[in-house]
């Protein structure tokens, strides 16, 4: 009787342990599955966010191109027989009506840009001229103007005559922080934000204005400063990728998650970044490591 009772207890203990183990395993799998679902949801949200921001900015850039192309179709600009000073006067009047524009300028097909006071500037080596004279719309990364040392962005479009021959280039200079202003209100998590990188990795728009003014390049900085190595990898991955995606990176003691997408109008890269802890705290951090 004692043996049977002992055997019975042993069996109860064994089955109890098996049931407990099964319950724990099921619980762990459920937690892991839940974590994975949360991570996937956040990744999808961030990719969609980056894509949406890129599309909105493309819309604003293209709207400005349309505005510039409208001016480029003015008869006085298309007619090569109209004196250059008359063209300049016309563009000055248009500039006065638009607070966003700092300068509208006419450049002939030979690369001579005509300015106020019968001044002429050779711009045939400028990227914006070389693209527009081939029939392409172009927008520059922010740069320091040689005229007044201010930070500007230049939009350029070709000017066609009535026979659809390119007879010149119209340029529109705007504030170099215009793009930064466009993404200023984008917030992800609590402190996350958006920024834009140019084709070679220079900061085109960033909440830190100095990055834009000084053309901060995370990839180049990462070669000299090890604290930027992870940032440099993020920037390189984002710039050379053609599809939106999500990556993890770290800077000093902060682990962040970032999504990126391309702007079709310029080829620049939108990156949205925020500390991982701002999404799901310890649970999110653990999930990403699992």
Feature map (PLM): residue ranges:
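Intrinsic low-complexity, intrinsically disordered coil/linker regions enriched in small/polar
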Residues: 162, 178-270, 279-280
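Extracytoplasmic/periplasmic sensor domains and loops in membrane signaling proteins
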Residues: 82, 88-91, 116-145, 210-248
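Juxtamembrane extracytoplasmic/periplasmic/luminal helical "stalk" adjacent to the first N-terminal
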Residues: 5-83, 93-100
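Extracytoplasmic/periplasmic ligand-binding sensor regions of membrane-associated signaling proteins
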Residues: 95-103, 107-186, 190-193, 248-250
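Amphipathic coiled-coil signal-relay and dimerization helices
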Residues: 71, 107-119, 201-207, 259-260
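Cytoplasm-proximal transmembrane signaling helix
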Residues: 12-20, 32, 269-271, 276-290
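Output-coupling edge of small sensory domains
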Residues: 143, 157, 261-263, 277
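Short hydrophobic beta-strand segments that form the core of ligand-binding sensory/regulatory domains
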Residues: 154, 169-171, 262, 269-273
């Amino acid at each position: 009787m004692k043996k049977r009772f002992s055997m019975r207890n042993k069996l109860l203990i064994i089955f109890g342990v098996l049931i407990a183990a099964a319950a724990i395993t099921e619980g762990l799998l459920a937690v892991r599955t839940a974590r994975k679902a949360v991570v996937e949801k956040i990744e999808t949200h961030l990719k969609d966010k980056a894509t949406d921001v890129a599309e909105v900015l493309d819309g604003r850039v293209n709207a400005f191109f349309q505005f510039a192309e409208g001016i480029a179709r003015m008869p006085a600009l298309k007619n090569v027989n109209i004196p250059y000073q008359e063209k300049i006067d016309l563009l000055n009047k248009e500039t006065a009506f638009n607070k966003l524009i700092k300068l509208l300028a006419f450049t002939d097909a030979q690369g001579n840009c005509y300015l106020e006071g019968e001044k002429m500037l050779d711009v045939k080596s400028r990227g914006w001229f070389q693209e527009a004279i081939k029939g392409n719309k172009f927008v520059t990364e922010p740069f320091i103007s040689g005229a007044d040392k201010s930070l500007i962005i230049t939009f350029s479009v070709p000017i066609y005559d009535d026979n659809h021959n390119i007879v010149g280039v119209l340029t529109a200079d705007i504030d170099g922080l215009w793009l930064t202003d466009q993404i200023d209100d984008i917030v992800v998590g609590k402190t996350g934000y958006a920024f834009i990188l140019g084709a070679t990795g220079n900061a085109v728009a960033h909440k830190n204005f100095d990055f834009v003014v000084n053309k901060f390049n995370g990839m180049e900085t990462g070669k000299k400063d090890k604290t930027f190595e992870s940032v440099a990898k993020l920037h390189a991955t984002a710039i050379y990728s053609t599809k939106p995606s999500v990556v993890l990176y770290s800077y000093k003691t902060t682990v962040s998650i970032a999504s990126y997408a391309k702007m079709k109008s310029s080829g620049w890269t939108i990156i949205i970044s925020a500390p991982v802890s701002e999404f799901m705290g310890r649970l999110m951090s653990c999930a990403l490591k699992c």
